[in-house]
Design a protein with these regions (language model features):
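Active-site neighborhoods and metal-handling regions in enzymes and metal-associated proteins
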Residues: 1-205
């Protein structure tokens, strides 16, 4: 029986730092939604995010020597999947844009992403994609109760996606986070219940 935290032992203060950091990251995402408009470039948004991270007393994890990414945030537009650095691309109304951000607050890392449509409401297939993937996220979160295996989380996510007739990019997975940006375990978006790594209360993914 695995009795240690797969994502590393953390003090209550470190867990609280992650909660506080997560709130700061969520606020930055709202700031992006309020700020972005057609006519701005991806690099404009990167600079804006960099300034907000500093304003909120955190640091841009991507820009550290550990990661050495050329920007504060990943910005992936339309057919780009994920992890794209900001470019000179100028946003147009209706662009589908994903933002992936990691910040460090009090030495603890928090990592999240969201997708939006520039200057418009999602419609048709794009609306179905965004609403279904969001529901799959919350299905995965709802599967986390007490000791749980990563396969249970993955299976809950996969069911929503399959019911919505969406494909799954199997090479991209969730992961542990906290003491480092990327930590074990991998948390795929597909899987079987009662398989995978056992998580305990105190693990952070």
């Amino acid at each position: 029986v695995q009795d240690r935290l797969i994502t590393g032992e953390k003090t209550p203060e470190q867990i609280q730092a992650m909660r506080d950091g997560g709130k700061k990251l969520a606020q930055i995402f709202q700031d992006i939604r309020d700020y972005i408009h057609a006519g701005m470039s991806e690099k404009d948004i990167d600079a804006f995010v960099d300034s907000k991270i500093k304003e909120y007393g955190a640091s841009a994890t991507y820009k550290t020597d550990e990661v050495n990414f050329p920007g504060a945030i990943c910005i992936s537009t339309n057919d780009e999947i994920v992890h794209s650095p900001a470019s000179d691309y100028i946003f147009q109304k209706g662009d589908v844009v994903s933002f992936d951000l990691v910040i460090t607050y009090k030495d603890m890392k928090v990592d999240s992403a969201f997708t939006m449509v520039v200057d418009d409401k999602p419609k048709g297939a794009v609306k179905h994609l965004l609403t279904t993937t969001e529901r799959s996220l919350y299905a995965g979160i709802d599967a986390i109760k007490g000791d749980v295996r990563t396969g249970n989380i993955a299976a809950a996510i996969e069911k929503v996606l399959k019911d919505g007739k969406l494909g799954i990019i199997r090479e991209l997975v969730g992961h542990g986070v906290g003491l480092k940006m990327h930590m074990p375990p991998d948390v795929p978006n597909y899987g079987r219940k009662h398989t995978g790594v056992l998580l305990h209360p105190g693990d952070t993914i």
